[in-house]
């Protein structure tokens, strides 16, 4: 049986024979948390779950890096927020006055979005609170006492060496409040002297938490403080001579702690662009949960190896992704054949890793997203009518073919209604114009040729006198008519769309027509109303 990469990581970690495995993750709270920079927690959770499956104790720790300096004003804040640049996120006021501070304003929606993922044994930490509560005090003391060696380690990977009076600490300036413009140059006991680019000179007692270790030292210190045994992180940290390489040496030599098992991952781009909180180019987990269930986000993350490039689009490509997920689900339940046994094992394992809970005994009802975008608009969102459209177009699984909407089980009904809501939200927010339509109650003002009128007339007669088991049969019948008239398919289908929705384009014609009330279509094609 093939193994998923999260399983292999768990098995390798288990060789360490620890009483508990703590999988670390962290996110900088510089604005809205998006799926591009929050993969850490989802990967960490998956590894923790795999460890527990093989009988190990494991938990996930997520650290909010909320003491880092604000470097850019995040979207959609006004530009006058630039006055807070350089200040720790934790010390910046809430932009709307609804939360305690900047951090809570952006962190709260993300943390709430984690609830549907049911992350077991999750511990959430605040970097700022860790400093303020003295958690980093001992590590800061050790780092300062070993400044010379830390400087040497840094310089091995720098083009320009650090100054001789450099200290691995960033004080918060008591004058301007910035943390990234101060230069710590001397210390005595717990007091650190610093100069700030604003012109202020001062001292800070590091036990008060009014400053922080420089990043690569902080990361190494955090590993030891929290006993981290494995940590996923973005590929930028994994670059040669990057954060992980430097922090690993510091962890080994300065803090006498083995660096965690690294799991670097590729960033997720959005429609080909790098996600950027400052530019407003991002897609959040909470946005995902409005158009898809949490398992589908897991599937998106875990279907490929972590360093494989990933580009996400919430537009038409999202429907393709949902089609893929549904296919994988059918294969996992033995409802569809995979191309070979190897593919079956691989896809089934991906599906299992993607699940929040154990797989239900029966495969969930999975009406096609793509078909629902059409059925939803025809039925104006009426669930009963949508179900009837699915039934009339052979879109129901065999076990539901003779089940009415009213008789659906609670599980099937909830699944169906939830997917309808997802499709509604997708249409409202991301559906392209060419996907959207409205069935016109009255004949729209249109121009059609005599040839198109004849085509519509013949189709109306066929609908009146013949029955079709599926849309394929009706599609073939329409082609017989247009070929007998010597018409181009485009002209024929334009006539259908023009008379029903007043547009030249629309959904797949055969299933669309069969989804509508037959008497309505016959009258409309005869141009009677």
Swiss-Prot record:
GO BP: lysyl-tRNA aminoacylation
Molecular functions per Gene Ontology: ATP binding; lysine-tRNA ligase activity; tRNA binding
Localization per Swiss-Prot or TrEMBL: Cytoplasm
Pfam families reported for this sequence: Anticodon_2, tRNA-synt_1f
InterPro entries per UniProt: aa-tRNA-synth_I_cd-bd, aa-tRNA-synth_I_codon-bd_sub2, aa_tRNA-synth_I_cd-bd_sf, Lys-tRNA-ligase, Rossmann-like_a/b/a_fold
Extent of motif 'KMSKS' region: 274-278
Principal EC category: ligase
Keyword Manganese: no
Residue ranges of the motif 'HIGH' region: 29-37
EC number: 6.1.1.6
Reaction it catalyzes: tRNA(Lys) + L-lysine + ATP = L-lysyl-tRNA(Lys) + AMP + diphosphate
Amino-acid positions noted as binding ATP in the UniProt annotation, renumbered to this chain: 277
Keyword annotations from UniProtKB, A to Z: Aminoacyl-tRNA synthetase, ATP-binding, Cytoplasm, Ligase, Nucleotide-binding, Protein biosynthesis
PANTHER family to which the protein is assigned, alphabetical: LYSINE--TRNA LIGASE (PTHR37940:SF1)
Family: Belongs to the class-I aminoacyl-tRNA synthetase family.
Protein known as: Lysine--tRNA ligase
Lineage, highest ranks first: Archaea, Methanobacteriati, Methanobacteriota, Methanomada group, Methanobacteria
Gene behind this protein: lysS
